[in-house]
Amino acid sequence: MAEYFSPGVYVEEYDNAPRSVEGVGTSTGGFVGLAEKGPTKGAPLLCSSFKDFRKQFGGFLSEYTHGEYRFLANSVEQFFINGGVRCYVSRVAPQDAVSASKEMGILTVTAANEGKWGNRIQISLTTMLKKKMQLLEKIDDAVYKAKSIEGFREGDLVEFNGEYNRIQTIYDEQVTFEEEFEDDPVDVEIVPKKVVRLAAFDVQVRYNDEVENYADVTLNSSSPAFIGAKLANSNIVKVEVAPASEDDEIGNPVEQILGEGIINGTFVLEGGFDGTMSKVNAGTFIGIDDGPGRRTGIQSFLENDRVNIMAVPGVAVPEVIAALTAHCE
């Protein structure tokens, strides 16, 4: 830095000797390759340990199923063993890889991403009738005055004495149902014997030792408890619910999914496929730049400037090496 000795006069000293070669930090790595599971589009995911990698991308791949493309997990493990602090991983997959899925009644459940790992996903549904509403007075046909409407919303399915109904409107404590109840639901006792219950259900999503539990889920699309909203942040599955029609019968929501007379049950996803290894080529690893959030392969690292060193483990295809070198430069 320049030193000022008097107005208009200063002296700056600098080293004229050749600079020595400086090492490049390798604490943060970037990896591209095939994995058991994990997203194949979007920004690479951060892994702060090999355990973290296994949770997001699965374990080691078999030589029998993945051949020369099986080395991603091995390389990430060695990276951490040899002092790596963190890495970012972008999973790639053959174009014909398929996500496991299952359509059950009005519900379609799909694994979060491609691969036969999804064939081990179990979905369990359990009918729950916990929340209660006491009706104090009948005002009109299918219109009642409730003691409290807390926990109930317009569009919710309800149950009374084995009969199912749907709340059409709620105004103050006045509740209008879509249909009239066959039995009288009014009860003015302090401790009521007759109550209307919210028809909800619990959902458990299981993949190996990873379990996600969602309590008091409903099929009411306008409710925060809607199954689509509740499972929106699931790391294991994505769900879609068929839109309701006027011809649909009102009934137990679990029966609408699993079938008539089934109020509790479990099903397994199927059809997941890792893809054909013979269809893996240079383009699989180089990837496609479809814009933010949709990039694949090496191109996905355009959304990441934190890595110090990059690798495509086990791949020595000249086009891939050239693309990787160009990206690093």
Residues covered by each model-derived region:
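Surface-exposed assembly/interface segments
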Residues: M1-E329
